[in-house]
């Protein structure tokens, strides 16, 4: 086999690692930081029309003030279900009804809750690191197969170094995102 037959798809590895980072950012967006944001409701599903539905598909989510989220529910019959879904979501928000509009005042976080949220953020980041390392392992396993099939030692070392450099860069992005999220959570 020639060296051209041993072509590791670094773009695919990077795409998969970036997917882990995108997933982490989505998880971070769902963490309540004491500031109102529409994204904090993304994980909340409403039992609407016989299936679990995201809140943004049953109403308009707005952030009129820094500590207030409003949901204008389109179907009046779903207002109670949306309210119930928010109460049971574990976000620690107490919905207030005003006709078809549900108001969600966002309380300030106490010190203990802030520390809990930083630990949750650290767990999310660790899951992302593990996912990135799993992609790295897949790439290294592929390189081992190439080496067994006749790839030169030098080429194997070059490719291994590239995979490791890519992994290190992606892990640094995770660490930076975690640091930013933790400082956002701890901000009073």
UniProtKB/Swiss-Prot annotation:
The keyword Chaperone does not apply. It comes from Dinoroseobacter shibae (strain DSM 16493 / NCIMB 14021 / DFL 12). Belongs to the RRF family. It comes from the Bacteria. Its main location: cytoplasm. It is found in: Cytoplasm. Keywords: Cytoplasm, Protein biosynthesis. The keyword Cytoplasm applies. This is Ribosome-recycling factor. Responsible for the release of ribosomes from messenger RNA at the termination of protein biosynthesis. May increase the efficiency of translation by recycling ribosomes from one round of translation to another.
